[in-house]
C-alpha cells in the first residue's frame, strides 16, 4: 500500500518540523518546503522513513508552488496540505499607522494569497482522496491586539477563505487551527528582547493536530488548547 502524502510548508523549524516529524514516524510521505535550503535539508535529514522530498523556495513564487504540486503528484498525490509557512513582517511589529504598504502587501502574499493559491493547485489531488486542508491561523485573527493588525488581518482573511472553501468542497475537511503561543523564532521575533522560555514547545501542539486528522470532525476553526483538553 502506498503511503499517504502530505505537503507541509514552512517545515524547516517550529510547528512545521514538529508535525512533519510526527507524520513521518506514522508512515506518511512528505513534500516539505522552506525558504532556507540548507536549514530545510538539515531538518529533513532527521525525518524517519521516506521519501520526503525537500523543495526549497518561497511560497509566494508561482513556479515554486507548481513544483510542490508536481512533486506531490509524483509521490501519488496529496491527501493533506498543511499551510504553515508564515511571516510577521517587521520586527518589532508596527502600529497600523506605521505599517509600510510594501510590508503589508508581503504579509498578505505570504499569509493569505500563497496558501489559497497552493490549495487551488492541489485541489484535484485532494478531491480524489477526500483530503484535508489544514491552515495554521492565530488568535490575532479574531482578537484586536495592538500592533498585530497586519498579520492578524491576513490570518482573518485566511480563516474566512477556509470557511468558503469548506462550503464549496464538502467532501474535503478544511481546518484553521489556532496553535496558541509557542516557543518559536517567529514568536521571539514578535516580542524581541522578551524571555519566551516559558512558552510551550511546538511539539506540544502536534497531538491536537493529530486528533483532527484522525477524527475528521466537521470543517471549521479549532483551538489547539480545546482539542488537547478533549483528548485528555
Predicted stretch roles:
Residues 138:
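Residue(s) in the substrate-gating loop at a strand-loop-helix junction
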